[in-house]
């Protein structure tokens, strides 16, 4: 005799068959029940096998910027000119206070050294711009503060040159 269990609450898979044989009536010993459970496992092709998640692809590396991108508006030129103006204003102020000579007189005394300093600072300022590195903030030294200070230094250095050119004497 075969039983088919199709109840969803049974522990045997749906569609499984159970063979049950009744014990003979003439036995003297206690009747033994022999049960065989035949369970069939099927592969369901409609569901894909679980796969381990693959790591996301690395982000594409950005292409190196072109010279026109770096030298564009609000790019490297303003930062470089601001840095050179800060350097020039502080150096001119210190030299005027120590020697009493005007900036134009000092420029006439050492033109090669001053030009070399400006070229080196310009090249050093271009390297991070071509590497697409943005300035990090370190305390009060933020990129916005550098831009603001550079703008004031450009105005101050230009005003000092105009004053000394008109008056012919050192400002400080």
From Swiss-Prot:
Name listed for the protein in its UniProt record: Carotene biosynthesis-related protein CBR, chloroplastic
Compartment(s) where it occurs, according to its Swiss-Prot or TrEMBL record: Plastid, Chloroplast membrane
UniProt record similarity statement: Belongs to the ELIP/psbS family.
GO cellular component, one term: chloroplast membrane
Biased composition (Pro residues): 46-63
Keyword Secreted on entry: no
Transmembrane segments: 111-131, 152-172
Region of interest (Disordered), ranges: 41-66
Keywords tagged on the record: Chloroplast, Membrane, Plastid, Transit peptide, Transmembrane, Transmembrane helix
InterPro entries: Chloroa_b-bind (IPR022796)
Membrane topology field: Multi-pass membrane protein
SUPFAM superfamilies: Chlorophyll a-b binding protein
């Amino acid at each position: 005799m075969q039983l088919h269990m199709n109840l969803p609450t049974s522990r045997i898979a749906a569609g499984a068959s159970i063979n049950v044989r009744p014990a003979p009536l003439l036995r003297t010993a206690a009747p033994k029940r022999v049960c065989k459970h035949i369970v069939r496992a099927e592969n369901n092709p409609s569901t894909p096998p679980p796969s381990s998640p693959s790591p996301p692809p690395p982000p594409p590396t950005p292409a190196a910027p072109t010279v026109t991108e770096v030298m564009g508006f609000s790019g490297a030129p303003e930062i470089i000119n601001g840095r050179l103006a800060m350097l020039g204003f502080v150096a001119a102020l210190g030299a005027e206070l120590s020697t009493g000579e005007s900036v134009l007189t000092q420029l006439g005394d050492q033109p090669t050294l001053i030009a070399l300093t400006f070229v080196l600072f310009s090249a050093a300022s271009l390297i991070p711009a071509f590497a697409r590195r943005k300035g990090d903030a370190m305390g009060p030294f933020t990129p916005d503060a550098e831009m603001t200070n550079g703008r004031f230094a450009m105005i101050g250095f230009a005003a000092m040159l105009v004053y000394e050119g008109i008056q012919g004497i050192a400002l400080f």
